Amino acid sequence: MQAQPIHARLMNGEVLSQDDATAFMREVMSGDMSGVRMAAALAALRVRGETPEEIAGFAQAMRESAVTVKVRPRDVLMDVVGTGGDGAHTFNISTTTAFVLAGAGVPIAKHGNRAASSRAGSADVLEALGVNLDASPEVIQEAIDTLGVGFMFARNYHPALRHAAPVRSDLAARTVFNILGPLSNPAGATHLVVGVFRADLTRTLAEALRHLGAKGATVVYGDGLDEFTVCGPNTVSGLRDGEIIDRTMHPEEFGVDLHPKTAIVGGSPAENAEITHALLTGGGTPAQKDIVALNAGAALRTAGRVGTIREGVEQAREVMKGGQGWEMLQKYGALTKR
């Protein structure tokens, strides 16, 4: 008897192995799957909820189909990225954090896009800061290998996603694609801090990253934000040495004050670029400085560069005061325009 096609198995409630999930997504990425079959499968997954193995399999196929950035091997290559879709309209916290980390000497391969639910995504604000988003993969590779930082504009690195775009648009609802971007870094990031839009996703994505071979990861839901928040508790799943630990973290544990959500709201790309510039040159408001320091501190701990998040927060504050992150951003912007 002929085996059922994967989309039919999903519609029947079957859970896929990681290999079968990869096979399904390869068919999507190749353009060989009809829109009806794709929509049925995505809807079935949405209703049931994706397993870590399925998410890892889908992400593996996305990685295979991506344009890659062939950086030299290293022990740590970090991405700090959110799924987007939190609707909080904050300034560009993860983008600012990435350059603080680069200023602290952590190699960064940031992967991002234009705005999902805010007015300015990472690509929008970096463009406003003078970065050429369309720099070639070879230029990005050179930037990561020589400067220690690079930004990959997702649209340019995942051309096969065009095959899923019409169905995603027609469904007009979140699907597994909304969480795959952070898991599909074209440079092969080894360590990640991933922000998610629902608390129940932290463990799921940490397990998926373990299946994908990540050396270290921190997945966080920040009380309504897809990053660490300074406005309330953080739901965190941390992957270290193959073990995953779930916990709730409060900003005060790390020497960071609590602030209202209104204190971290952003605006247009130009307005957010001004905030990023201020923070990377020792300025910014207390809330802005605290939330970037907390996110950078957690990333420094994830990368193994400090023993505790509190130590990381203090190091991040020193980098912001010293302007090393801004220096990195200026050098990177110039390199992308060559």
UniProtKB/Swiss-Prot annotation:
Q: Does the keyword Amino-acid biosynthesis apply?
A: yes
What does the entry list as the binding residues for Mg(2+) 1? Answer: 94, 227
Name the residues that bind 5-phospho-alpha-D-ribose 1-diphosphate.
82, 85-86, 90, 92-95, 110-118, 122
Question: What does the note under cofactor report?
Answer: Binds 2 magnesium ions per monomer.
Annotated Gene Ontology cellular component terms: cytosol
Top EC category: transferase
Keywords assigned by UniProt? Answer: Amino-acid biosynthesis, Aromatic amino acid biosynthesis, Glycosyltransferase, Magnesium, Metal-binding, Transferase, Tryptophan biosynthesis
One of the record's GO molecular function terms: anthranilate phosphoribosyltransferase activity
Briefly state the protein's biological role.
Catalyzes the transfer of the phosphoribosyl group of 5-phosphorylribose-1-pyrophosphate (PRPP) to anthranilate to yield N-(5'-phosphoribosyl)-anthranilate (PRA).
Q: How does it assemble?
A: Homodimer.
Q: Which family does it belong to?
A: Belongs to the anthranilate phosphoribosyltransferase family.
The protein depicted here goes by the name: Anthranilate phosphoribosyltransferase
The species this protein was found in: Deinococcus radiodurans (strain ATCC 13939 / DSM 20539 / JCM 16871 / CCUG 27074 / LMG 4051 / NBRC 15346 / NCIMB 9279 / VKM B-1422 / R1)
* High-level lineage: Bacteria, Thermotogati, Deinococcota, Deinococci, Deinococcales
Which gene is transcribed and translated to give this protein? trpD
